From Swiss-Prot:
It comes from Nepenthes distillatoria. Residues 17-164 form the Peptidase A1 domain. PANTHER family: OS04G0448300 PROTEIN, OS07G0603500 PROTEIN-RELATED. The keyword Protease applies. This is Aspartic proteinase nepenthesin-1. Extracellular proteinase found in the pitcher fluid of carnivorous plants. Digest prey for nitrogen uptake. Belongs to the peptidase A1 family. GO terms for cellular component: extracellular region. Its main location: secreted.
């Protein structure tokens, strides 16, 4: 660690910057998205079902679990400390979240019985349906924001009946 901090390889991805690092003892190499929106490092850890390279905290002799809760509930998993290696520099006891996968949108909104998110075969489209519960006066759906990375494409929204 020098006066300018730790250095590692950074390269451009598809709309994000990626950095090379290793996690654990023995070190497992990964590419990670650089996210300046959070000061906590999140990795996808086993037994997540997504198709990304995954950290295995239980296979590391330097992993230690910490109790936690995360404010916006966008992931589920555990929190711990681990040795991170950037280039040739290893730093022990870095706090990070070991996510077991992103929570689906209905679970994030805590309205799973009122909302469905269908991902069709066409990867350029999806359906988001809000359904009326048996007692509509008790429905409380929080405000949320969805971000779409469309490149140079046009996004259009069509009102339709759910299940249509």
């Amino acid at each position: 660690i020098g006066p300018s901090g730790v250095e590692t390889t950074v390269y451009a991805g598809d709309g994000e910057y990626l950095m090379x690092l290793s996690i654990g003892t023995p070190a497992q190499p990964f590419s990670a998205i650089m996210d300046t929106g959070s000061d906590l490092i999140w990795t996808q850890x086993q037994p997540x079902t997504q198709x990304f390279x995954q950290s295995d905290p239980q296979g590391s002799s330097s992993f230690s679990t910490l109790p936690c809760g995360y404010g916006d509930s966008e992931t589920q998993g555990s929190m711990g400390t681990e040795t991170f290696t950037f280039g040739s520099v290893s730093i022990p006891n870095i706090t990070f979240g070991x996510g077991e996968g992103p929570l689906p949108l209905p679970x994030q909104l805590d309205v799973a019985k009122y909302i469905t998110l269908d991902l069709p075969i066409d990867p350029s489209a999806f359906d988001l349906c809000f359904q009326t519960p048996s007692d509509p006066s008790n429905l409380q759906i929080p405000t949320f924001v969805m971000h779409f990375d469309t490149g140079n494409s046009v996004v259009s929204f069509v009102s339709a009946q759910c299940g249509a």
